[in-house]
């Protein structure tokens, strides 16, 4: 593994609160609320309008994606991403801090962290502990929407951090990359259904290793430390000195794998953007593994 100085992937609630208190928010520092919830559970934009971190803009993951794709949450184009984040006052010189309101402490924030990185922006961090701990620690909130001055952002896709269906299919034979799936064990094995999914059976890509993303978080919603994270990878026999692809259902919690590896000093984990949603619909049946299906047979 090549050792390099990595931009801090996490910032603390204390650091952000102090940055806000001392007037550092502006073109050089922007905060994004990247919350998203399953339909019928919570309304992310409504909750943002009710209360959010002062100065935060709402990052709508439903809007900032490839809406023409048949698969969930696929990346937008370079131009689409650049236009969207530019409207949020983000330039190539902005430090971006992302959080979400998930009770686990973090869910969609690592996806947005990865999106910035895959489009060439390295000065991006996740708020460690999320909005859950921001509230718990008594930091200020507001209902006032943020209206930043638009900025110019130039997006350059870093293809080394992104894997396609064809590349993962080829990897079944070449085995050049390790493959880690971040969904729950039941969904990975095929013994539990995919939530809110019509026509999508659970299971996994042949050869994948299961590391549920919740294992990277403490009970209090903070990211575990590098030593604990390395131990998790070692337990699963995932070699952080070798190439690694992360996958899940739709390329969201896979970004937790990328973040955890980054915190261990490995910044080059690629995400299979289509993940299981695409794989289930396109891949040969023999490349899909499901205990649930085999038990029914």
From Swiss-Prot:
Subunit structure, as described in the record: Monomer.
Listed name of the protein: Thiosulfate sulfurtransferase
Catalytic activity of the protein: thiosulfate + hydrogen cyanide = thiocyanate + sulfite + 2 H(+)
UniProt enzyme class: transferase
Domain of life the protein comes from: Eukaryota
Subcellular location: Mitochondrion matrix
Binding-site positions, substrate: 187, 250
Entry function: Formation of iron-sulfur complexes, cyanide detoxification or modification of sulfur-containing enzymes. Other thiol compounds, besides cyanide, can act as sulfur ion acceptors. Also has weak mercaptopyruvate sulfurtransferase (MST) activity. Together with MRPL18, acts as a mitochondrial import factor for the cytosolic 5S rRNA. Only the nascent unfolded cytoplasmic form is able to bind to the 5S rRNA.
CC annotations in GO: extracellular space; mitochondrial matrix; mitochondrion
Residue numbers carrying N6-succinyllysine: 14, 136, 175, 224, 237
Assigned EC number: 2.8.1.1
Glycosylation sites: 35
Keyword annotations: Acetylation, Glycoprotein, Mitochondrion, Phosphoprotein, Repeat, RNA-binding, Transferase
Modified residues (N6-acetyllysine): 14, 136, 163, 175, 224, 236-237
PANTHER family linked: THIOSULFATE SULFERTANSFERASE, THIOSULFATE SULFURTRANSFERASE
GO terms assigned for molecular function: 3-mercaptopyruvate sulfurtransferase activity; 5S rRNA binding; thiosulfate-cyanide sulfurtransferase activity
Domain named Rhodanese: residues: 25-143, 173-288
